[in-house]
Design a protein with these regions (language model features):
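Long, basic N-terminal domains or extensions that often function
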Residues: 1-191
Length: 191
């Protein structure tokens, strides 16, 4: 972005990191460490130990009673997209019910991260913010780029600014006065 006011920098980096890690936890992505850094023109988050894929989740769903009318069982199977052979009967304190276990395979982390980045940016609230151009997105100063890399690959995503879109990239710029050339980033060491 352009110059972030000095009084806002440290708090902004800490808060943004907290929002981002909270979003990771919501989608079941565990991580080892999360570090944040701030400069007058950047907020940086580095997450170590992210898995390559979300964990597979097995959810148990209780259906109708065993003695319920057939349409109730048909509706349960249709709503869960299952067949009769996937259902089992179990005894509970309230009687005998049909149950099914639904297994949801985890998505690749690189497919989940772009939405987390966009959500985190939109959730973050600055004490004072602005819009620029004909965009509706608000930030402390105009955003120029979003560097987003996972496992040496650019994440395929974008931030919808309202009128324009800011596509994620693996490029950043050096110091604006002493070397503003573009720098390609594949990992945190490159950054």
């Amino acid at each position: 972005s352009e110059e972030i006011p000095a009084r806002m920098q440290k708090r902004a980096a800490a808060e943004f990191s907290q929002i981002f890690t909270s979003e990771l936890e919501k989608v079941g992505l565990a991580y080892e460490t999360a570090n944040y850094f701030v400069t007058p023109r950047r907020i940086t988050i580095s997450i170590d130990g992210l898995p390559l894929q979300q964990a597979t989740v097995v959810e148990e769903r209780r259906g109708p009673r065993v003695d319920a009318p057939a349409p109730a069982l048909d509706g349960f199977m249709r709503s869960n997209n299952i067949s009769r052979d996937q259902i089992e009967e179990r005894e509970t304190k309230k009687g005998r019910f049909y149950f099914v276990e639904i297994e949801t395979k985890g998505k690749l982390t690189k497919e989940v991260l772009p939405a987390i980045i966009e959500t985190s940016l939109k959730k973050f609230a600055w004490p004072k913010s602005m819009r620029w151009g004909s965009n509706s997105f608000r930030w402390v100063r105009p955003l120029h780029s979003i560097l987003a890399v996972f496992e040496a690959e650019v994440l395929h995503g974008e931030l919808d600014l309202g009128h324009d879109k800011l596509v994620f990239t693996n490029m950043t710029k050096g110091h604006r006065c002493c070397g503003a050339e573009k720098i390609s980033v594949a990992n945190f060491a490159d950054y």
